[in-house]
Amino acid sequence: MASRLLRGAGALAAQALRARGPSGAAAVRSMASGGGVPTDEEQATGLEREIMLAAKKGLDPYNVLAPKGASGTREDPNLVPSISNKRIVGCICEEDNTSVVWFWLHKGEAQRCPRCGAHYKLVPQQLAH
């Protein structure tokens, strides 16, 4: 039994020695011709690349990310972007609620959800293209 373990360890040691170059330093093996596996930033193209570069700058040009939630008070309403003067908004009201309360939000002052009282305000938005 011990001889099998020693033979296995010897084979591993020989394999490790073969992996070293002539100078004794470990030989570096790359998986791709360019020096390794490319990162997501190096491999992305087109729209995906634009979104990744904008995200590094803290921008969200195509509204891919979830909107930042506010406290929903009159002083700090939830901001709803829109390209028109009105937009329909859905409020869940409570975390475990199974229905959505839909209401129209118009440009101007902040408006309240009819059920829970959370405030929403319509803000103008420019299209990315």
Curated annotation (Swiss-Prot):
Localization per Swiss-Prot or TrEMBL: Mitochondrion inner membrane
Targeting presequence: 1-31
UniProt record similarity statement: Belongs to the cytochrome c oxidase subunit 5B family.
Protein name, per record: Cytochrome c oxidase subunit 5B, mitochondrial
Function: Component of the cytochrome c oxidase, the last enzyme in the mitochondrial electron transport chain which drives oxidative phosphorylation. The respiratory chain contains 3 multisubunit complexes succinate dehydrogenase (complex II, CII), ubiquinol-cytochrome c oxidoreductase (cytochrome b-c1 complex, complex III, CIII) and cytochrome c oxidase (complex IV, CIV), that cooperate to transfer electrons derived from NADH and succinate to molecular oxygen, creating an electrochemical gradient over the inner membrane that drives transmembrane transport and the ATP synthase.
GO-annotated cellular components: mitochondrial inner membrane; respiratory chain complex IV
Ranges in coiled-coil conformation: none
Listed pathway(s): Energy metabolism; oxidative phosphorylation
The gene coding this protein: COX5B
Species name: Pongo abelii
Membrane topology term: Peripheral membrane protein
